[in-house]
Curated annotation (Swiss-Prot):
Organism: Schizosaccharomyces pombe (strain 972 / ATCC 24843) (Fission yeast)
Entry membrane topology: Multi-pass membrane protein
Protein name from the UniProt record: Uncharacterized rhomboid protein C19B12.06c
Active site: 188
Family, per entry: Belongs to the peptidase S54 family.
Any one GO molecular-function label of the UniProt entry: serine-type endopeptidase activity
GO biological process: proteolysis
Length: 258
């Protein structure tokens, strides 16, 4: 009985591992793996202060924290919720924009601008709180989902008036205040506002040019072709049809809200 149960568990784990490595897009897998690895390391080493976002780290010129703070978490609950958010929300976004563009966006303006807003708030409030966690990314993705960037996800919800969907996106971070009533609300709200502006195609200048992305993918095609579940610019354009990176321009979000 125990042997049979062990075999079933082993088969299930093997199936989940295969699904994880072969079905989920590359950037999503990398972020999830880094989150898991750093979560384990955090049990034994105090890495939150080194990777977390704080005014103290900025003064000490630890600029890497502008990019690393989503990958570490304070506790088990935030760790689990962060992973859940990544698996539920990130894959569709990556398929829509491609792996390279997704990396550029989530380690670029979608992450850095909210981080800067948080640091300014910390300076004004004379706070040295350390912010870690993937909450900013999750709220960004939720806002873009609500604003029809992914119109086939929840058609009933997306039939609501646009103003209502914008209000829902802005209210989402506020609902988390009872769990964490702190200055982090500034980062979360900034992430939502930036995502709303991006959804209306007013931040196209932050997107890497499609021609450059194609050049990079062509230059390193031998390496890229060997990487499982890498989403190329061409595949992203095909997936979204007339979405954020049109085939004829490969660098524009001109369609805005689908």
């Amino acid at each position: 009985m125990a042997i049979e149960l062990g075999e079933r568990i082993s088969t299930s784990v093997g199936f989940l591992a295969e699904l994880f490595l072969m079905k989920i897009p590359l950037f999503t897998v990398i972020v999830a793996l880094l989150t898991i690895i750093l979560g384990i390391v955090n049990i034994f080493l105090p890495i939150v202060d080194f990777f977390g976002l704080s005014w103290h780290n900025l003064i000490n010129i630890r600029l890497h924290t502008l990019n690393t703070y989503p990958l570490v978490h304070h506790g088990v609950i935030s760790f689990i919720l962060g992973l859940l958010g990544i698996f539920l929300l990130m894959p569709r976004f990556e398929r829509r924009y491609g792996t390279l563009c997704t990396i550029a966006m989530f380690f670029g303006f979608l992450e850095v601008i909210p981080a800067i807003a948080y640091l300014i708030a910390c300076y004004v409030a004379e706070s040295d709180d350390v912010y870690v966690g993937i909450g900013g990314w999750v709220y960004s993705l939720l806002a873009m989902y609500l604003l029809n960037l992914f119109g086939d996800l929840h058609p009933k919800l997306l039939n609501l008036p646009q103003v209502v969907r914008m209000a829902l996106a802005l209210v989402a971070p506020v609902l988390g205040l009872p769990l964490d009533f702190s200055i982090t609300i500034v980062l979360h709200l900034t992430a939502v506002v930036i995502s709303i502006i991006f959804s209306f195609a007013y931040m196209d200048f932050f997107l890497p040019r499609g021609g450059f992305l194609v050049w990079v993918e062509t230059k390193f095609s031998k390496i890229i072709d060997a990487i499982p579940n890498y989403i190329s610019v061409t595949e992203a354009a095909y997936y979204q049809a007339d979405g954020a990176i049109p085939i004829q321009d490969l660098g524009s979000n001109s369609s805005g809200i689908v």
